[in-house]
Amino acid sequence: MDYTKHINQTDMTTSFADFVATQDARNDIQLKIREYCLMLCEALEQDFVKDSLRRADFFLHNDPEYRAKRIEDIKAGKDMYKFSIESGRKYHKIVMETESQSKSVHCFVNMKTGELHKAASFKAPVKEPRFNLLIIKEREWVFENCDWAGGYLYKNAYYTG
């Protein structure tokens, strides 16, 4: 009895010409993903500044000198977190760095698919992606709701998409 009689034996390999023809599209996608990572870094830095100003306003009535000094430090860029990209073999790693050069990983972004992962450790992401930066609705939500501490990366965060 032939169990494979219903299987269509089409060739599943890609020809070299097809591979070359789609290479430009793959490169464009990877460049877009890197651009979105840079935009995420910028949004995270802006959120840190906004949150620092909000925390400085908390001291307005109790210690106005501290508040004024803190606002000067924020404008001068002191005691700020800087977000940058470290690219590996498979992922872009969004890294948060302090002035004292201590680093921590904020998230990982898959270079080929654009999937955004919460960091499981300094070297590895969690298995399940939280968002996809190539999907417009998810990307816009991430840029509007990202926070420097990473609360938006938890599964029970506000996203309902």
Language model features: what each stretch is:
Residues 137-161:
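C-terminal partner/receptor-binding element of secreted or periplasmic proteins
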Residues 72-107:
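Exposed beta-strand-loop-beta-strand "reactive/processing" segments of non-cytosolic proteins
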Residues 5-83:
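Negatively charged, low-complexity tracts enriched in Asp/Glu with abundant Ser/Thr
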Residues 1-2:
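Acidic, gly/ser/pro-rich intrinsically disordered tails
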Residues 113-143:
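A short, surface-exposed interaction/processing loop segment used at functional sites
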